[in-house]
Swiss-Prot record:
Record protein name field: Tetratricopeptide repeat protein 36
SMART domains hit by this protein: TPR
Record has Repeat as a keyword: yes
Transmembrane stretches, start-end: none
Organism, as annotated: Homo sapiens
Name of the gene this protein is made from: TTC36
PROSITE patterns: TPR, TPR_REGION
InterPro entries tied to this protein: TPR-like_helical_dom_sf, TPR_rpt, TTC36
């Protein structure tokens, strides 16, 4: 099956426009690990480990298509540590997949509030909230959330900001057309 990093590379190749960093077990580097440790150091270690295990079970259930089990596990993690943003962020993803956009937005608001708008959970919550806003045609709200996620280091959010910028999109299209013409010059008859 490959290492988590192999999976991340394949994810980036085959799905370049999906949020990166949501792959369970992916080694995001020392900075991300430090960020996560700082977010979690306020919680009792035993409860934190149990909460993370429940979240992992929830993510695995969601990936297997068992959204009811995923929601149950995320709910258990929230009951265990109701002040930890990560479980709300994960539950929001499962709720969105289930079609409960209002519930997903509610969880994302709570995750942003608990994280203080900082760290990995906030970054992921801003990206998710931005995607939901974009799907609902609320581009200004989407842009604000993507800007916040980009400031927190999300490359996906940066790409979304470019896509939301009509001038950048036009420039990218013109550049692509020019490069295509340079690669395939017309017959000079």
């Amino acid at each position: 099956m490959g290492t988590p990093n192999d999976q991340a590379v394949l994810q980036a190749i085959f799905n370049p426009d999906t949020p990166f960093g949501d792959i369970v077990g992916l080694d995001l580097g020392e900075e991300a690990e430090k960020e996560e440790r700082e977010e979690d150091e306020v919680f009792p270690q035993a409860q934190l480990e149990q909460s993370k295990a429940l979240e992992l079970q929830g993510v695995m259930a969601a990936e297997a298509g068992d959204l009811s089990t995923a929601l149950e596990r995320f709910g258990q993690a929230i009951c265990l540590l109701p002040e930890r943003a990560s479980a709300y962020n994960n539950r929001a993803q499962a709720r969105r997949l289930q079609g409960d956009v209002a519930g997903a937005l509610e969880d994302l608001e709570r995750a942003v509030e608990l994280s203080g708008g900082r760290g990995r959970a906030a970054r992921q919550s801003f990206v998710q909230r931005g995607l939901l806003a974009r799907l609902q045609g609320r581009d200004d709200d989407a842009r604000r959330d993507f800007e916040r996620a980009a400031r927190l280091g999300s490359p996906f959010a940066r790409r979304q900001l470019v896509l939301l910028n009509p001038y950048a999109a036009l420039c990218n299209r013109m550049l692509a057309d020019m490069m295509g013409q340079l690669r395939r010059p017309r017959d000079s008859r």
